């Protein structure tokens, strides 16, 4: 991602053409195009300020520490929450990207002891309710349909998630995970430094698979916002 991807995102969100943006910012369309593609080594501060002002962006832009957490959250559990809280405390902005795949998710349900299948809206609602008071957290849903499960699908998945993050204007400095085997893959395929949180499950010895297999045995690891989903099925 170039350093001006956030400007590309702002232009798309504003719904303007490059010519309209260039005219409003006092530059030619060619100059703007080169700027956005990092072809201009020392861009004019005056032009940059005008561009940011037109798009409603802060200038000069403060460098933020941005983190990302990937997961299915099928279902959300206290291990996820511990990971997210730790990550959230280390960055200015944290993006939670929830992956979903109708075929895979259906199979997870059929192989589980759950009485009903969590939907994508269910999983998003759990995240939104759990972190509603943390203003530096952003939550997204990413369609992984047709992407082969890792470890075989890293190339396809990484290309898909790169495009998704560029579209959303997400340029993370850090990835946070509890999965030791994922860390080198994130570094290799996404080129983003990865931080491991509680990989040995010392603080939260729980997994989504355990809860799917026996929700009531691991009841204490199911968050308050998620418990009503299971209670309804009794």
Q: What positions do the PLM features span?
A:
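Recognition helix of helix-turn-helix/homeodomain-like DNA-binding domains
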Residues: 26-42
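Short alpha-helical "recognition helix" segments of helix-turn-helix
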Residues: 20-22
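Nucleotidyltransferase catalytic core that binds NTPs
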Residues: 60-234
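A short, Lys/Arg-rich alpha-helix, primarily the initiator
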Residues: 1-16
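DNA major-groove recognition helix of helix-turn-helix/homeodomain DNA-binding modules
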Residues: 46-61
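Helix-turn-helix/winged-helix DNA-binding modules
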Residues: 13, 40-43, 203
């Amino acid at each position: 991602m170039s350093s001006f991807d956030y400007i590309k995102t702002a232009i798309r969100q504003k719904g303007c053409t490059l010519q309209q943006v260039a005219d409003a910012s006092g530059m030619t369309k060619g100059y703007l195009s080169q700027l956005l593609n990092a072809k201009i080594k020392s861009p004019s501060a005056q032009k940059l300020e005008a561009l940011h002002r037109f798009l409603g962006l802060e200038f000069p832009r403060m460098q933020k520490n941005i983190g990302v957490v990937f997961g299915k959250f099928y279902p959300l559990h206290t291990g996820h929450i511990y990971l997210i809280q730790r990550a959230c405390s280390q960055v200015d902005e944290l993006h939670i990207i929830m992956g979903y795949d109708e075929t895979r998710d259906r199979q997870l349900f059929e192989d589980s002891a759950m009485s009903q299948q969590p939907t994508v809206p269910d999983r998003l609602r759990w995240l939104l309710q759990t972190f509603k008071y943390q203003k530096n957290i952003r939550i997204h849903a990413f369609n992984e349909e047709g992407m082969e499960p890792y470890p075989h699908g890293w190339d396809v998945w990484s290309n898909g998630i790169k495009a998704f993050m560029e579209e959303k204007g997400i340029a993370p400095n850090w990835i946070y995970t509890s999965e030791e085997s994922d860390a080198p893959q994130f570094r290799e395929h996404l080129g983003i430094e990865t931080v491991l949180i509680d990989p040995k499950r010392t603080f939260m010895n729980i997994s989504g698979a355990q809860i799917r297999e026996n929700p009531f045995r691991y009841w204490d690891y199911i968050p308050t916002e998620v418990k009503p989903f299971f209670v309804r099925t009794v």
